Amino acid sequence: MRTKVEYGFGIIMEQASRLIDKDYSLAMTKYEQANKIFSEARDSGISIISKKYPNFKKWLNKEASIDFNADDISDIYWLAVSIGGCISSSRGNPFELINLPNVGRLLRTGIDINPGWENGSFYSAMISFTTTRSDLNEVMLRDSVDYYFDKAVLYSDGKDAGPYLTYAESIHKPFQERKNFVDKLNYVINM
């Protein structure tokens, strides 16, 4: 699951993003390819967790409760990221978008189990997830993202580039804060 997700984001989605303005048709083909990879990872993740917790699909629909433990944390994280990849690569497909609450639920569950896991990776992922929430105004969005950013930096001792890059892409770029965007990128380069 992890390898597929990393390949989907790190190679295929990156290629699609670079192509979108030059060759829209090829970019869309890449997004479809990434979506297939993420869908396979998502299905694998659901299958893995469902074998241990037969009510897992009901849990995703808030129809059951499950007491997850530390052994589940990696599967929870990579499932959340694979669902996020399905949503991202679908380019707004409503049949994928309806799964967005599941991403948040999985990420919050991971934080509850072990907030410091993999240098605060759940908090870094929450930065991206939070920016997708349409129910937050700009002040609430920034407050929430700042909270998750601070936690991610805390748990990584400031040594993980991920939160800085995610913050720059999720906040500074859409709000056209060029100086802050460049400052974050320069900070990462000099880490």
Please report, for each region that a protein language model flagged, where it lies by residue.
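Short coil/linker segments at helix-helix boundaries
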Residues: 2-109, 121-151, 167-173, 177-191
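Residue-level recognition of tetratricopeptide repeat
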Residues: 72, 117-119, 158-160
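Solenoid-like repeat scaffolds
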Residues: 112-113, 150-157
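Long amphipathic all-alpha helical oligomerization modules
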Residues: 157-165, 169-170
